[in-house]
Amino acid sequence: GSATSLSYYNKPLLLTYSGGKDSDVCIELAKRAGIPYEVVHSHTTADAPETVHHVRQKFRQLELEGIHCNIVYPTYKGERVSMWSLIPKKLMPPTRIARYCCNVLKEASGRGRAIITGVRRAESVSRSSRGALETITAKKSDKVVFDLAPDDQERMYFDDNDAKRRWFEQCKMQGKISINPIIDWSDQDVWGYLRECHTEINPLYYCGFSRVGCVGCPMAGRRYRYQAFERYPKYRDMYLQAFARMLEAMVRAGKPATKWSTASDVFDWWMEDTNIDGQLRFEEEQTC
């Protein structure tokens, strides 16, 4: 992977860092391998405060070790955006099906680079059949798969963690080569390795989270999302404000909502979206 990055792009590997346990494993692996690498984090604007702090703390440590780190802030149509300003622009809430937030808030980093991700098959049932190598393109008809298992699906690097993720992937549309070194690791492998390395992890793992990600992510279960909003009520308020602006924008665009009258109506509908395993969720009990 490192040789490919240097020969193909003339740049070191770029490790995409989310602030979660899998990203921490990838950093430890890169350190131990002694390869040149850089680290990038996509600031989604909807991550929990603990995650934001953990990322910045990790980057300070890495910079002291001589590792170049960069935080990428999201833009849409040439303008800086947040989750809250993006929703009115899109005239709809982000859902499990319409995951525009992933594309705008997470997918911009790593263009024209060979990237390392912490994608794992064990993170969800749907990831279980990912293979070894694939080329990812904007059009399904242009896709080339270097694997025994056929596939015709498009990929989203940071959130499309379905069963067909590979160890090595190439995205022609975004100019990315994606390397997933822990694709076959189990949860036990991850936690065991982090303990062995004495790695400082995101404090949310000590507070009842089994995974970390955007607060309110529609890929999480309804019960867990409500628990997240109990912990972070200001995020709920920001979603409500964004939904209110969205309804106003829909009227201005000549597309008034038919199923919602208020921001609360939108929020209640949005929270009923059912769960897909593999994203932010809480355990049964919170400990802090």
Show the residue positions of the predicted features.
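Nucleotide-activated chemistry modules centered on ATP-dependent adenylation/adenylyltransferase
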Residues: G1-C288
